[in-house]
């Protein structure tokens, strides 16, 4: 009986040692993410994602507004395309994430300055937009106008 009690006590101590040696759980809240990311400002064209992904000539100062609106109406995600060619996906500050289209629709085809929390992962960029304004001083060439 004493032998079984000793074995159980040793096994229990081993489990406690292993649990204490495990790394702490990963942070998952937006507050924790914000603590690890900095506020940034990006500038670029609000448009559908399909054209600049499929057409390398797609850039931040020239687009077909009809094509962009057709893609957006069909459900293509909205992005901000910078002059450097980086695409920023707008995301919410909540989990689960919620749609940002309503916030961005008035800016489709416009060059904007967006400020917020920026995230990057393996070359993909996202931004939680806290402020967005049109940059009227940047000329965007719209096909068909």
Predicted regions span which residues?
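OB-fold and OB-like single-stranded nucleic-acid-recognition modules
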Residues: 20-145
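Bacterial N-terminal signal peptides that target proteins for export
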Residues: 1-11
